[in-house]
């Protein structure tokens, strides 16, 4: 029974993620430093990075909020204490 519960929990977490969010972080080949966010599938969190401005992929969001909505869906958002403040 415990095995089945674990299976369903893992299946639910991985099934609900948007496929774009599973792409790796790509900084790009240009030299700008635009603050952006990506979904880190290892930590299962949206994290900040500096985007170069060209190249890249769909796992690249202009805000923590946008990343969270795209990768977790329209659920309640809990901002971690160390999350960057949006201005």
UniProtKB/Swiss-Prot annotation:
Residues 1-16 form the signal peptide. Belongs to the venom Kunitz-type family. Sea anemone type 2 potassium channel toxin subfamily. InterPro entries: Kunitz_BPTI, Kunitz_BPTI_sf, Prtase_inh_Kunz-CS, TFPI/VKTCI-like. It comes from Anemonia viridis (Snakelocks anemone). GO terms for molecular function: potassium channel regulator activity; serine-type endopeptidase inhibitor activity; toxin activity. Disulfide bonds join 21-71, 30-54, 46-67. This is U-actitoxin-Avd3o. It comes from the Eukaryota. Coiled coil: none annotated. PROSITE patterns: BPTI_KUNITZ_1, BPTI_KUNITZ_2. Transmembrane segments: none annotated.
